[in-house]
């Protein structure tokens, strides 16, 4: 109302300067006209004018007056129109203000009704909240009772398990003590004896190993000596072969010189010597092949053979012009060679003796080696037996360790059970803390309810103020905003309720659809039962007919048998009738079976119908 009146005043104040300007212009024209009259009056008095001039002047004055009057009239009409427009605008503004006031009153009424509805809803919500709080407390109390019962049960179980474990630990400790005492009594003397035997065997092994090392060193030395001797013998044999070749050359030279029979005899002796030497070579080669690398030869044989070889080369280098000198020198050289050959034979015999001695020594060494190997094998067997005994002892010790580990595990289980008891106590403490927190929350909820009551009182006072102060639109706007928020909350609640109702309705529809489908199924089952009943009736009728036919056929057969003797064709007819009777009997049995199956199906359908009716 104030705003509309202020706008109307502002418009009138804005239009007032135009009015003042128009009035000012009219007054200025009137002043000018009066001044003209005043200025013209002395002229009329002073100057004589004609009537025509006066008339024209009067006409001009009148026209000017008319124009001024017309101007004043037009200005007044404009002012009147402006005043009318302002009045119309003021009336329309007043009407609009009244309409707005009515709309605001309606809004206030609607807001008051909404506030009352919200108060009712708030009361319902308070009651629902109280019920929820009560249910929460009941659920929490039940939960706490269940927790306490579970904790007590667990504590009892842990106590029983603890007592069982303690008893088991005591039994195991007793067993361990008994086993350890028995094992110590049995094993300690055995261990001491085995340790003594092991130390003695170790000493024997060390001594035998040292002996074996010494024997192996001796054998290696003897083999090295034999190898060197065999090498020297081979070198001597090679030198002898070279000497034979030189002797043959000398024979050829003697034949050329055509000397006497002395040379021939010497040559024969030489051939005998060569045969002996070859025989001795063969004898030397056979033991050299048997034994390679044994005993050392004297260096004197090698030196003599080298001297003979040099002398033979000198003889070959002499010219052929001196046959007599050659013959004498050759005889001397042959004698010398025979002497050397005899020496070589003697040395070969000595070397063969030494080789045989070395062979005997080698055989002795091998026998001793075999004996040592046998002793080693025996010692190894004894060591293996001792190791097996040690393994058995270690197995028993490992069993003892396992028992100790089991005892430790049981102790760990006891420690874990104690830890679990501590954890349960902690959980109890946490549950007590949660109970205290719940109590604090309950107190907070009570405070919130008190605050809600205070807000209700404030709402009542604000409603009274709204009734008293209808002009305070700003407060109404704030209250309208609050009511809008409450309206939105109420609408949300209504939407949630509508959603729940829709869900319930959809569920009801589903249930109705299921019921309809079940009804349809029942109807179909009833139709099936009726059909099966009709079929059973038909089968019964057919069975009765077949029974009648069978009875008639039997009567006819009996009548024929009584009246006439049966010829062959009658017998065939009777056989056919009997076959037909058998077929009819089989059909009758099948009909009875179908009837029984139909009866069972009817019973099952009846039970199913009863179940559907009960459900």
Swiss-Prot record:
One of its GO terms (biological process) is regulation of exocyst localization. InterPro entries: FPP_plant. It is found in: Vesicle. Residues 1-18, 29-38, 322-343 have a biased composition (Basic and acidic residues). GO terms for molecular function: protein-macromolecule adaptor activity. It comes from the Eukaryota. Interacts with WPP/MAF proteins. Binds to COG2; this interaction promotes the association between cortical microtubules and EXO70A1. Ensures, when in complex with COG2 and FPP2/VETH2, the correct secondary cell wall (SCW) deposition pattern by recruiting exocyst components to cortical microtubules in xylem cells during secondary cell wall deposition by recruiting EXO70A1. This is Filament-like plant protein 3. It comes from Arabidopsis thaliana (Mouse-ear cress). The lineage of its organism: Eukaryota, Viridiplantae, Streptophyta, Embryophyta, Tracheophyta.
């Amino acid at each position: 109302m104030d705003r509309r009146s202020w706008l109307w005043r502002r418009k009138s104040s804005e239009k007032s300067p135009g009015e003042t300007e128009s009035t000012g212009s009219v007054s200025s024209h009137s002043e000018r006209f009066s001044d003209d009259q005043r200025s013209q009056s002395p002229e009329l008095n002073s100057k004589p004018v004609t009537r025509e001039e006066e008339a024209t002047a009067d006409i001009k004055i009148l026209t000017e007056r008319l124009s001024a009057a017309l101007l004043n009239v037009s200005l007044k009409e404009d002012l009147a129109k402006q005043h009318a427009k302002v009045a119309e605008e003021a009336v329309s503004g007043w009407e609009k203000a009244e309409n707005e006031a009515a709309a605001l009153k309606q809004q206030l009424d609607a807001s008051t009704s909404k506030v009352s509805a919200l108060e009712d809803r708030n009361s319902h919500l308070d009651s629902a909240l109280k019920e929820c709080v009560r249910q929460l407390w009941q659920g929490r109390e039940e939960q706490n009772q269940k927790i306490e019962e579970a904790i007590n049960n667990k504590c009892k179980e842990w106590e029983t398990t603890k007592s069982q474990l303690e008893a088991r630990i005591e039994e195991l400790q007793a067993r361990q003590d008994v086993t350890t005492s028995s094992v110590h009594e049995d094993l300690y003397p055995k261990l001491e004896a085995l340790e003594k035997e092991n130390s003695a065997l170790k000493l024997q092994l060390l001594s035998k190993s040292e002996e074996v090392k010494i024997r192996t060193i001796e054998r290696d030395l003897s083999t090295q000596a034999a190898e060197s001797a065999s090498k020297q013998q081979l070198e001597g044999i090679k030198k002898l072969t070279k000497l034979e070749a030189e002797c043959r050359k000398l024979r050829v030279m003697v034949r050329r010189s055509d000397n006497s029979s002395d040379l021939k005899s010497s040559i024969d002796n030489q051939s005998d010597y060569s045969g002996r030497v070859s025989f001795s070579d063969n004898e030397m080669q056979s033991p050299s092949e048997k034994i390679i690398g044994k005993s050392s030869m004297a260096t004197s044989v090698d030196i003599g053979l080298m001297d003979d070889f040099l002398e033979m080369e000198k003889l070959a280098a002499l010219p052929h012009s001196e046959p007599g000198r050659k013959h004498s020198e050759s005889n001397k050289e042959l004698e010398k060679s025979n002497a050397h050959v005899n020496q070589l034979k003697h040395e070969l015999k000595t070397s063969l003796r030494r080789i045989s001695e070395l062979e005997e020594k080698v055989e002795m060494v091998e026998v001793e080696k075999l004996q040592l190997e046998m002793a080693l094998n025996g010692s190894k067997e004894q060591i293996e037996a001792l190791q097996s005994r040690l393994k058995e002892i270690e197995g028993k010790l490992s069993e003892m360790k396992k028992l100790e580990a089991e005892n430790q595990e049981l102790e760990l289980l006891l420690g874990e059970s104690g830890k679990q008891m501590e954890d349960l106590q902690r959980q109890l403490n946490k549950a007590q803390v949660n109970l205290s927190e719940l109590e604090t929350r309950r107190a907070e909820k009570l405070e919130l309810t008190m605050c809600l009551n205070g807000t209700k009182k404030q709402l009542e006072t604000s409603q009274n103020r709204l009734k008293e102060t209808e002009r305070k639109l700003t407060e109404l706007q704030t209250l309208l905003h609050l009511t809008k928020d409450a309206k939105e909350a109420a609408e949300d609640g209504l939407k949630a309720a509508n959603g729940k109702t829709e869900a319930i309705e959809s569920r009801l529809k589903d249930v109705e659809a299921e019921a309809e489908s079940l009804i349809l199924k029942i109807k179909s089952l009833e139709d099936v039962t009726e059909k099966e009943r009709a079929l059973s009736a038909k089968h019964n009728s057919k069975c009765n007919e077949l029974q009648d036919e069978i009875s008639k056929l039997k009567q006819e057969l009996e009548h024929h048998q009584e009246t006439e003797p049966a010829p062959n064709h009658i017998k065939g007819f009777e056989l056919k009738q009997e076959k037909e009777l058998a077929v009819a009997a089989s059909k009758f049995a099948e009909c009875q079976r179908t009837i029984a199956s139909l009866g069972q199906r009817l019973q099952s359908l009846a039970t199913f119908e009863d179940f559907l009716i009960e459900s």
